[in-house]
Amino acid sequence: MRTLLLAAAAIGVMSASAASAQTFTFTTLDNPGDPTFNQLLGINDSGTIVGYFGSGAAGHPNIGYEIAAPYTTYTPVMQPGSVQTQATGINNAGLVTDFWSPTNLGPNGQGAPQDANFGAVRQPVGKNFGFIDTTDPLTAGLPQADQTLGINNSNVAAGFYLDANGNSHGYTYNLATSAYTEIKIGGAGTIAATGINDNNEVCGLYTTTKGSMFGFVRNASGGVVTHFRVPGSKTTQLLGINNAGATVGFYVDGNNLTHGLYYIPATGAWVPVDDPNGVGGTVVNGINNKGELVGFYTDAAGNVHGMLVTVQ
């Protein structure tokens, strides 16, 4: 199993510029269950982080976990009955978004996924947990794919599903009303919603009908969509958003190098976020309202490590 992020409204187009005023401090956090493959995907305002270890290749299932400061104890987050679970987001009440699979077949010989995945939210119930199925009923195709990727403090989640033709559709899901709302962007061929803040602003990514990939932020009403693309990049994806509208994600430059990114609303600038050990690339997946970031990087040996970033 792997994250299937994509390999009309009034529109605001944001030109991006680089900035160097930010200082980042990087901390590597790896679950010892597999120190060769960890990804940190979400963080709340208490600094509690969710992620997973295991590449998803056959025999190396994704095992979700939660970890709180001082970041020494990893608590499993596994959907009941699952073989694999990726814990993807967490709000301040401790609700955790995830997607899970009943199998661990790994990709086929052509690299295509064979493991179906389904969206869910883990909810604290007393000293135990309940799991809410968030899989969009429009999910179709083989294998089925629905991924719930983020949740705000009003318990509205964001994610995407694949239709019978393999096209991705972004959505939000309100846990209180069990209502799905599709995210639509004019001119987009495929859409994935990846994060949502307490203002119900949604971030994500889309491909145009010509195959170009952009990040986006959509306001709560859906009437304004701001499109983001780092100049000269081949791909830009936005994966997390906080209440100030600061977004994080990654871009692929003209040399096919992957860089984490952090967007500063006050200046309109992109700031690259590159872990000094991430010679194989850096991705930022989550941001909280204190400006703490989480993600992962690939080292010189090809191992993937979880990453916590503080911003000064």
Please name every model-derived segment.
Residues 3-4, 20-312:
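Residue-level hotspots at or immediately adjacent to binding/recognition sites across diverse folds
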Residues 1-20:
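Gram-negative bacterial Sec-dependent N-terminal signal peptides
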